[in-house]
């Protein structure tokens, strides 16, 4: 045994190339001993309890349910997994198999039933399935029975479900939904006509004894309806035939269908009559409750004379013809009413009354003069006053815009341009002077100074006396001061009588080209508030000033300049 081991050991070393040769080259050289290396590498294999490692196991513990009752208390089985909803068709062996624990199985089935009922329309879901199980067919049968219990349910659907429900063996049969036509109004007309004539629907066909499922053809039905004399057109009779035949199994009319439809119509008539009777009873009771206190008042009051029933004019609803007044219109109406009441009580003339109204002022002279009422009589006065109020609002808006945009238009400029100076009532010797015309004065005495007018009125004798009484005052001035004084006088007073410019009367005559310039609005000549009429310049001004002016050409336009001034010529 030892010899075999040594032979095997030497063969293994020779294969590894670690065995020393029998004829060593150098006996003193160190020899590699592989035994410790092999013993170290194969140490685990030499142990007695050496075996392969086992695979890891995963154990899942399911919590115990209260409904679960184990058969053996020693060995408690795990609870079955929850049913996973799937759309696969159940096989026969899956249906027959039931778990051992019945309570658990019943709880799972009830839970599945609740989920199915809360899922949505169970009837539609089951009818659209290609194949159903016996339990699903049973549920569908119960749904159809519940619907057939209602009075307004269709008879065709109930009949098909009752026949198809017991057939549980046909699992793969598909439920085809049927269409139901709406009930034509001519059917109720026909039944009401027969009811008023006390004719039964089954008696007109003379087939009562032949059975309820006896079929009635289209020609027989039309002939019977015409024989009774029902007031219907041919198209309406055709609609009734189509509707009644759609309720049958083979698109035919039977006695059973006629009886059922007539019964449904009579029940609907009874419900409507009950509802109307209840409404009439409530209205009558309400009227009696209202008449009770009225009768007591009539008894207490004294007997009155009998009233004559005459024609009364119907009340006209004027709310649609009127409109609500604005605040400005209400204020104007109030002002007119107060003015009328005051004028009836006044003993002074109206023009003096208007002058008294002028005493109420706001403090700003321009505003007061603009807002004065006009002295013109008639309708023109109201138009002028409304125009002045409108212009005052325009002035306020322009002032706000100029202030917000920062335009260099002062308040004085806007007042001169937009506000009217107003009519001024002036008394002279207890007489009202006429309104000043453009370019003139109220009277001639204003042209002269007040001292000269006073002297003229007194006469020549009185004027001499006044000259004697008033001493002359002399003042010395230099030549330059006298020259400036005379220059100012020439500017103030022109030659001859004083004449005013015709445009001086109109507001804004000092503002030639006034317009509101806004940064966001393009410049437009039509926005000018006032335009001054001026003479157009001559086409060739050089012809009228040949001595001083001469046309000079600079590039592409012509300029007029003094010919003696310094000139710079450009040669293009």
Curated annotation (Swiss-Prot):
Q: Where is this region: Disordered?
A: 62-85, 146-169
PROSITE patterns of this UniProt entry? EF_HAND_2 (PS50222)
Enumerate the InterPro entries for this protein.
EF-hand-dom_pair, EF_hand_dom, EFC12
Which positions does UniProt annotate for Ca(2+) binding?
Answer: 212
Molecular functions (GO terms): calcium ion binding
**Domain EF-hand: from-to ranges:** 196-231
Q: Does the keyword Metal-binding apply?
A: yes
Q: Does the keyword Calcium apply?
A: yes
Report keywords, A-Z.
Answer: Calcium, Metal-binding
**Source organism superkingdom:** Eukaryota
Disulphide bonds annotated for this chain are none
The molecule here is called: EF-hand calcium-binding domain-containing protein 12
Q: Which organism is it from?
A: Homo sapiens (Human)
Q: Tell me the classification of the organism that encodes this protein.
A: Eukaryota, Metazoa, Chordata, Craniata, Vertebrata
């Amino acid at each position: 045994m030892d010899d075999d081991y040594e032979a095997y050991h030497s063969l293994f070393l020779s294969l590894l190339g670690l065995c020393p040769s029998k004829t060593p080259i150098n006996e003193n050289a160190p020899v590699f001993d592989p035994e410790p290396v092999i013993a170290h590498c194969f140490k685990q294999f030499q142990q007695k309890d050496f075996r392969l490692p086992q695979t890891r196991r995963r154990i899942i513990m399911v919590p115990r349910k209260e409904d679960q009752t184990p058969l053996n208390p020693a060995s408690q089985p795990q609870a079955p997994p929850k049913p996973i909803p799937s759309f696969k068709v159940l096989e026969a062996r899956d249906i027959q198999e039931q778990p051992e624990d019945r309570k658990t199985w019943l709880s799972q089935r009830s839970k599945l039933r609740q989920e199915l009922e809360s899922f949505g329309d169970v009837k539609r879901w089951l009818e659209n399935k290609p194949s159903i199980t016996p339990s699903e067919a049973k549920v569908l049968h119960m749904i159809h029975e519940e619907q057939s219990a209602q009075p307004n349910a269709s008879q065709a659907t109930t009949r098909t479900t009752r026949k198809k429900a017991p057939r549980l063996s046909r699992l793969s049969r598909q439920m085809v939904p049927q269409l139901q036509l709406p009930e034509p109004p001519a059917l109720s007309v026909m039944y009401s006509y027969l009811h008023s004539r006390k004719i039964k629907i089954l008696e007109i066909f003379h087939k009562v004894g032949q059975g309820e499922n006896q079929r009635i053809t289209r020609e027989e039905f039309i002939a019977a309806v015409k024989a009774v004399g029902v007031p219907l057109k041919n198209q309406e009779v055709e609609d009734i035939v189509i509707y009644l035949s759609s309720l049958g199994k083979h698109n035919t009319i039977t006695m059973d269908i006629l009886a059922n439809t007539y019964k449904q119509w009579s029940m609907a008539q009874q419900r409507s009559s009950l509802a109307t009777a209840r409404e009439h009873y409530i209205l009558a009771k309400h009227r009696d409750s209202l008449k009770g206190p009225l009768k007591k008042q009539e008894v207490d009051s004294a007997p009155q004379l009998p009233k004559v029933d005459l024609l009364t004019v119907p009340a006209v609803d004027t709310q649609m013809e009127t409109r609500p007044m604005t605040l400005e219109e209400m204020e104007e109406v109030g002002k007119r009413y107060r003015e009328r009441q005051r004028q009836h009580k006044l003993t002074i003339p109206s023009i003096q009354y208007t002058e008294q109204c002028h005493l109420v002022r706001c403090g700003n002279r321009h505003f007061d003069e603009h807002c004065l009422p006009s002295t013109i009589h008639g309708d023109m006065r109201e138009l002028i006053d409304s125009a002045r109020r409108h212009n005052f609002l325009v002035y306020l808006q322009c002032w706000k815009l100029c202030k917000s945009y920062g335009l260099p238009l002062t308040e004085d400029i806007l007042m001169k341009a937009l506000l009217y100076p107003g009519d001024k009532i002036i008394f002279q010797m207890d007489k009202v002077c006429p309104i000043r015309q453009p370019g003139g004065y109220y009277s001639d005495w204003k042209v002269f100074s007040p001292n000269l007018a006073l002297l003229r009125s007194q006469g020549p004798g009185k004027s001499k006396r006044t000259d004697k009484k008033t001493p002359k005052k002399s003042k010395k001035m230099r030549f330059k001061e006298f020259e400036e004084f005379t220059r100012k006088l020439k500017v103030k007073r022109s030659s001859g009588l004083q004449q005013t410019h015709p445009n001086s009367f109109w507001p804004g005559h000092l503002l030639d080209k006034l317009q509101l310039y806004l940064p966001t609005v393009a410049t437009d000549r039509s926005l000018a508030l006032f335009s001054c009429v001026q003479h157009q310049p001559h086409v060739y001004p050089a012809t009228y000033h040949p001595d001083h002016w001469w046309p000079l050409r600079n590039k592409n336009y012509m300029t007029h300049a003094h010919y003696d001034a310094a000139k710079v010529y450009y040669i293009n």
